[in-house]
Amino acid sequence: MNLLAIDPKPVVAAQRRRRIEDLEQKMLGLDSGAMTQELLNQTKHHFCEGVYAREFFLPKDHACTGRVHKTACFNILLEGKITLAMGSTEEPQTIEAPQFFVSEAGEKKALYAHEDSVFITFHATEVTDEDKMMDLFTVPTVKAFERYRRELLEDKT
């Protein structure tokens, strides 16, 4: 008999990311366009000497998924209580403000607000154009992130 020891973490993380993407597809099928735009319009952008902070409000009993982050970033739940699902965590976690954590590059999050909540991500950059932030720090899907990583590796060779 041949035995092969493998690390199951990448496989399990990929399965969790797929579940988050499946949730996102179901949410996109709902008629929530007006609400989504209203929430995006409430998003606040803050800049200070090489740091960009994106402040996002999520009302009680609402859920959202985020884009895939290209780099690691700081996260703060400033107000409220949420259930947070990420590809890198074993199971969804319910957390209450104030809470701080780091999410790694390639992370995709799903949030559900048990209370009105304020969530902030922090990124290092000198760019101060709000319209460029989303594409500068995120990609829409895990496949796009994998493509982005391949291109980075190709540029280094």
Name every feature range the model reports, one short phrase each:
Residues 1-55, 85, 145-157:
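A short, N-terminal "cap"/entry segment at the start of jelly-roll beta-barrel domains
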Residues 51-70, 95:
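Conserved short histidine dyad/triad with adjacent acidic residue
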Residues 62, 70-71, 107, 115:
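A generic "binding-loop/recognition-motif" signal
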Residues 69-88:
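Glycine- and acidic-residue-biased ligand/ion/polar-headgroup-sensing regions
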Residues 81, 108, 116-118:
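Structural motif
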Residues 86-110:
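Short acidic-glycine-tyrosine-enriched beta hairpin
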Residues 114-157:
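Double-stranded beta-helix
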